[in-house]
Amino acid sequence: MAIEKLPPQLANQIAAGEVVERPASVIKELVENSLDAGATRVDIEIEKGGSKLIRIRDNGSGIPKADLCLALSRHATSKLKSLDDLEAILSFGFRGEALASISSVSRLILTSRTAEQAEAWQAHAEGTEMAVKVLPAAHPVGSTVEAVDLFFNTPARRRFLKSDKTEFTHIDEWLKRIALARRDIHFTLKHNGKTVRNYRPANTESQYIQRLALVCGKAFAETCLRIECQHNDLSLSGYLQSPSSANGYSETQYFYVNGRLVKDRLVNHAVRQAFAQYAEGVSPGYVLMLDLDPHQVDVNVHPAKHEVRFHQSRYVHDFILQALQSAISQSMELALNNEPEIQQSPDRQVSPTRGAVTAPLYSESIERKPSVSYDVRDSHSVTNQRDYSSGSSSYRSPLKPSARNGDVSLPSQSSIRAYGELLSTQSSSTHSDRVLSTQQNNYAVRSPAGNQNGLAASNSHAASMPAVIAGEFWVLVRDDKISLLSISMVARAVLKAEIAAKFSQGLVGQPLLMPVAVAVDDDWLAIIENREQLLRKLGIELSIRLGQLIIKKVPPYLRNSQLAVLIPELLQWIQLELPSDAAVVKWLAEQGANRFTSAGEAWFGLNALPDDVQRELYNLSQDLPWEQWMKENQSDR
């Protein structure tokens, strides 16, 4: 048989085999087009599970008359113009196949009007001849797409459709997914003339929690942990099922990359690993949204765009893992700190911030009520002090209603933040006792990490951790002076001491889940052989295969670094000279600043440092002119 170019209709129907799987996939493509057009409201109407009619109406920018016919042709799109655009794509669609594929297997009507046009225009296309007719029509600014009699010209495909109820279930599930990602959009869904879903815009946190309850269930919304974490160009937000409520496998598992719902094994592994020490074998529910530089992720790897490929997958995995571990750890600490207070006040009841899905509970007034929320930027391993605020994570947990009678208002936000940061054990000391100097307290403080730093505490009872202000400083009272001690500065000193204590015996390298490959230079093999002892002491395992440097193991202090850049720089450094142990320790401490740590761990580590180092750090604290403030206050009176 001779090679011939396929007719347009046949080519479009073949492409439709990947794009148009069932009515839900048609709705997915059309709604994503509406969102790319800047719509703030999308109305979906279907009949007989979508097999008879699919109608999508939006208030987006619309399509000019001159582009209507072109919009129904293959590989025609306004989303990109060059390869550079593809490598930094942020829109849902970019291949220009959806409308052409849908029109090849249905009777399609596209009506649209732009703000610049005085009237709307309507394009008709059927799958038989692919001919497009354009006629004037009445329509507001925006677009409406109707797909009638899906698969009318491909009977084999139509026979594989399930029942109307099953097809509707798939449509409803997809709408839930997009409703979680786009809280700013008003979505409605009608089936056979009846409105079954109405997701109003969720512009406030309480409104989004209400949408979360509608989509994921009341139990998930009541007990989930709020995730907010940012580090360099990575940002993670969303909700995670709490360990106390996780049981078995949850179907509420949604992961979004730059607003696009994807399936990724890395995030599933990170979530299970974060839960391992609290609930082993559990696959909890989550709604997580990862935002990163579009150049660092490839979305053009799956026909239906369900998968992505990260350029630094290990970096992304560890970022998600440590963000989740930090939030879970903070929730556990807050629960422990809150429990004694409730026991000491049997006649008091804390009003819940979340509960059943009712209008009063999720009203906007909840925004004005204090909630158990505090900034835990100190939970990250600190970098330079000027960069310290760039990495942040926050946790918010709903308070469960008490069985006791009587309500009291929650304490102020600042009080909750200071109390939530305290990791000391139960103590009857007053607030002023908590900010006294280490020489004036002997209450025990526990290390959240179980003192895994390799440092021995200088005494068996460390001082109670003082209050934390702005998530970045401890408030110290010493010799009638009030001063602020930088948590980031102390964390760097603790990290350096930890590395120094371990480096003399050699660091233990941790295997990478996915080894990193880098194009090799000619002299790297000689460097690896000559500096083998140093690399082994660093816990770094490298190999060269097929012209590539394979990074297999690194110490924990380098896990969050961009290894493809860092390791070549290390090889160049040790090629020129054999660095001293002190220089290597300093270098590792600088790289390890990307790790996350908590104020409690930093305080425990501070008390484990030698006395002379502690004094040096305390001397670097910044005094506050409280005496001058008092004089000015008294003079004003």
Swiss-Prot record:
GO terms for cellular component: mismatch repair complex. One of its GO terms (biological process) is mismatch repair. Gene3D superfamilies: 3.30.230.10, Histidine kinase-like ATPase, C-terminal domain (3.30.565.10), MutL, C-terminal domain, regulatory subdomain (3.30.1370.100). It comes from the Bacteria. One of its GO terms (molecular function) is ATP binding. Residues 343-411 are annotated as: Disordered. The keyword DNA repair applies. Residues 343-352 have a biased composition (Polar residues). PROSITE patterns: DNA_MISMATCH_REPAIR_1. Keywords: DNA damage, DNA repair. This is DNA mismatch repair protein MutL. The gene is mutL.
